Amino acid sequence: MTTHNNKRGKERSRKPSEPGIKVFVDHKKALILGQVGKSLAEKSVSSNMKDWYEEYEIACEQIRHENEQLLDGFVALLRNQRLAPRTIKGHRDNVEFFINEFLLYEDAKRPVDGIGEVDAFMGDWFIRKAMWSTPRTIKSTATSLFKFYAYLAALDRITPAELAALKITIAIDLPDWQARCERYNDGDIEDWRGED
């Protein structure tokens, strides 16, 4: 039986190769592509995601502060209209859920930029995310949002045309939103959106 030895008389094994490809950008620095630790691309994406998230959180905090001031003014308006404290609280809570949860859920949007999102909120997101969603709460939330945007129109934050478009959207889509909510809350119906 013969053994193959290298020049030193020991058997020499090759170190198993690590996954990834080393590309030499210059004669000293290797850029590693693949899955050897964290590649530069992964580090860059990770760093960018962290930076983006921090910026998003800062923007959301700023918007929440602005929203609190808007809500205070909105509540003052409702008090001047001599609404009952319970009604005022309901309107405030409905609007706060829309502006501080929905509009900040995926992106940092201010209420003036979110007026076009009312249909997506009422016809889908609210139904799925609010455990208290019923056809009745759909109607009361739509009323709250219209009152809030009427308040923003009085402050010249949105145009009368935007408010009129919202009024039409609510008038036309409210029955559909309520029907979707009823279907969603019925566990026997799979196509709660009514798309089939």
Annotate each PLM feature.
Residues T2-D196:
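Charge-rich, intrinsically disordered N-terminal extensions
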